[in-house]
Amino acid sequence: MLSYRKLAMRVLGRPLHTGGGIDSPRPASQRAAALVLTAALLTGAAFPAFADTYYIENGDITISAGESGNDVTQNNVTTKNDTNTIITNQKTDKASSNTVTINAGNDKVEVTLDNVNIKADSGSALISKGDVTLTLKGDNHLTGGNGGSSSYGGDGITSSGSLTISGGTVTATGGDSTSSVGSGGSGIYSVSGDVTISGGTVNANGGDGKNGSGGGSGIDSSGGVTVSGGTVTANGGDSKDGDGGSGGYGISSCGVAISGGTVTANGGDGGSGSGSHGGNGIYSSSGVAISGGAVTANGGDSKDGSGGNGIYSSGGVTISSGSTVTANGGNGEDGSGGRGITSNGGVTVSGGTVNANGGNSDYSNGGDGIRSLDHVAISGGTVKSNGGSGNLSGGNGIISYDIDLSGSLELTAKAGSPNGKALSRVGSELDLNTIKDKLDPGAKVTATDADGKVIQQVSIPRPVEPEEPSSSSDGGSATPSAPASFLPGLTVTDKDGQRISYTSIRGNNVLSLSVGRFTASLHASLSTLRQLRAEGIDTITFQTILCSTTLSVDELLAMGGEDAEVVLTHHIRSSTLTVGGKAV
């Protein structure tokens, strides 16, 4: 902090001399200005504050929103309207027990943490209220105190309002519980409002439970948790030294939205006793939406209870293009293995890469790779879902009341051992023949047993690229064309009767038409066929994804009159032909 004398010299633009030499007298105008400034400071008149650095070793720091900056109080001295509040340690290798409290009220407060190292004796290392932004520089450590008379460990950061974190690195760690009635503190705990992480490195560790109490969560928010960038590692605390305690959650929130960055969320391990279980990697009481970034969520293990889930949502789970998600259920020894992804709502995957694995169990059931009490819909991306192994029964690769597979997905579902199912819909293995017509070219769905042996598979080939145009002595040049309008009188419609594009190739007296659909119909009038025959075409082939038909133009012409229409319809692997409305 600057002294009044130093501040006066800085404002007057005059160097401060600290030696014993004799200075030349200042002009009378400067002497008068100095007297006025000093008098103003001594009588408490307002004066613009300079950006300053505050050392946490010097005492607790309280920051609130001022009129044009932050009001910062330390050791009963308040600096008004600080425009760039920086908190740091004089010795970063030694933690201070002093704490930071930020109260934005109805305004906003921004604070920079520059290599701060705090370990509270009790309670939280940093408390924020209202709309607060923490900008990180260097490597910061915020550790809550171990449980005292309350038995609950303190939080690394406690927030009531909107908390935004960006830049640098922070490790926020909850304190440990001290008895069976408390729990470990959270690395970051939001009583209300959202936690937003837009960059930097955030390590959030829940404290451990003791004598059967539960571990704390890495990040615990009563609002939402949003990650758009940076690297986030959230670890739930373990439950130790007693019966019935459960591991903390990696991330626990009302809603989780991840659009970028790298997120790793690990549930803590459960203690002993039938009431214990491993913590969930990611838990949401609403929904989980992952639209980008790389996400790894691991459920914690448990000795006597069940393993935690990789991702658990009371609402729905949506995963879309640009994201990579790995979700692993924790292992149970006496209890069941945890699930990779589980939701009371739907699970929807439209793109990206997903690996979901159920946990294993030594004496109970293996966990499911993906489980939904509503529906599972996969329409794109690459998905691998494996049931865990168990003693009583294996987990399912995917289990739901409804499994909707469509589009250009690539899915491999593996049953757990023993007796698990790869794709369990209402307790029965899904028949892949029922989904073929909903798959696009390039799609592939594989169901395997616990040993990886394929029990069902459907693969939709991509359309063969047409050859380069070449000249032909018969039937014209071999020139591919796509839109139907390029061949007047020949149209192709989809299963709903809507006109669609197709690929055509002429060569060697053959006209070949192809379309990347399971169901499609070729329409041609006999007058059009006569024109094609006059141009040297004597054979027409029609190719859909799983069916191919060859027609003789001469035979078709012999079947009807001038205005009759020929309709050739393909449906999956079967075909029907009508001429003039009559089946042939």
Where would I find each of the regions flagged by the language model?
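N-terminal secretory signal peptides that target proteins for export/translocation
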Residues: 1-26
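Histidine (H) residue identity feature
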Residues: 17, 141, 277, 375, ...
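A composition-driven surface/loop motif
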Residues: 2-11, 31-42, 46-470, 474-476
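Short, flexible helical or helix-coil boundary motifs
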Residues: 11-19, 439, 520, 536, ...
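Long, contiguous ectodomains of secretory-pathway proteins
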Residues: 86, 94, 108-114, 119-121, ...
